[in-house]
Amino acid sequence: MRRVAPALFLLLVACSSVVLYERAESDTLYFGTGKPDGSAVTAAEWQQFLREEVTPRFSGFTHWEAHGSWKDVPEESHVLQLIHPPGHEADVAAIIDTYKKRFQQEAVLQVRGDVWLRLR
């Protein structure tokens, strides 16, 4: 029994340190800011879009400004990173469709992947 107890103890310690990750999906969306009339989506318009369209659908997200190009034309853009449980495809599609209509955009680039996450 004295030999089994240390082995059992080590097994319990090893099992207690197992870190569990949760499956999720990651959507990274790239929004161009150039409008057909030559103007650009303003910072205030972008913040309003986030407030009205993104925040009600996702409780947390990250966004940042970027410099990109579309069809060889450089333009400022916004990148939106969404990490969410599976099953939010309709919410992501609604955000994309609304942005395209509101700001007269041809397209929004969407990059999707499966991820494993945990909060530490």
What are these regions (language model features)?
Residues 1-3:
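Positively charged n-region of N-terminal signal peptides that target proteins for export
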Residues 18-24:
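Glycine-rich, aromatic-bearing surface loops/beta-hairpins
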Residues 55-73:
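Short, glycine- and small/hydrophobic-rich beta-strand elements in well-ordered beta-sheets
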Residues 74-120:
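Helix-rich interaction surfaces within compact, conserved domain-sized segments
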